[in-house]
C-alpha cells in the first residue's frame, strides 16, 4: 500500500509539472508492473487510484489546469480592480503565484481523498 501511495504521489506531481497525457504515458509501465506483481489482485482499483492521482495533479499548477492559462488571460483582460483599501487601484493579476494557493489546496484535497480511498479499499 505504501508503494502505491508513493506512486500516486509521484504521479500527482508529474501530472502537475508536465500535464496529464505525458504523465499517463510515462507512468503506465510502473502501474502495469504493479498490476502484474504485488497488487495483481487489486489491479482494477490500481487503475482508479492512478487516474485519481493524475486528476489531482492536473489542478496543481496554472499551466497544468485545463483552462488555466486561458483563465489567467481573461482575468487580466477584464481589468478587475480590487476594492479600495487606501492604496491606488491596481488591476488584478491572476498568475502562477495566486493560482498556486488554490491549486495546491485543491490538488491536496483530491490526493487526500484518493489516498484515503486506497487505504480503505486495499
At which residue positions do the language-model features occur?
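Membrane-interfacial helix-loop connectors
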Residues: 1-86
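Interfacial loop-to-transmembrane junctions
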Residues: 73-109
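Juxtamembrane boundary at the C-terminal end of a transmembrane helix
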Residues: 115-122
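Entry/N-cap segments of selected transmembrane alpha helices
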Residues: 1-13, 100-113
Amino acid at each position: 500500500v505504501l508503494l502505491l501511495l508513493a506512486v500516486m504521489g509521484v504521479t500527482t506531481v508529474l501530472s502537475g509539472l508536465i500535464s496529464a497525457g505525458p504523465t499517463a504515458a510515462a507512468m503506465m509501465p510502473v502501474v502495469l508492473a504493479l498490476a502484474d506483481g504485488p497488487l495483481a489482485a487489486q489491479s482494477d482499483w490500481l487503475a482508479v487510484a492512478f487516474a485519481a492521482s493524475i486528476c489531482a495533479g492536473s489542478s496543481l499548477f496554472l499551466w497544468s489546469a485545463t483552462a488555466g492559462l486561458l483563465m489567467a488571460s481573461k482575468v487580466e483582460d477584464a481589468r478587475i480592480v480590487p476594492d479600495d483599501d487606501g492604496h491606488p487601484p491596481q488591476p488584478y493579476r491572476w498568475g502562477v503565484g495566486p493560482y498556486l494557493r488554490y491549486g495546491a489546496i485543491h490538488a491536496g484535497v483530491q490526493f487526500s481523498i484518493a489516498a484515503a480511498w486506497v487505504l480503505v479499499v486495499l
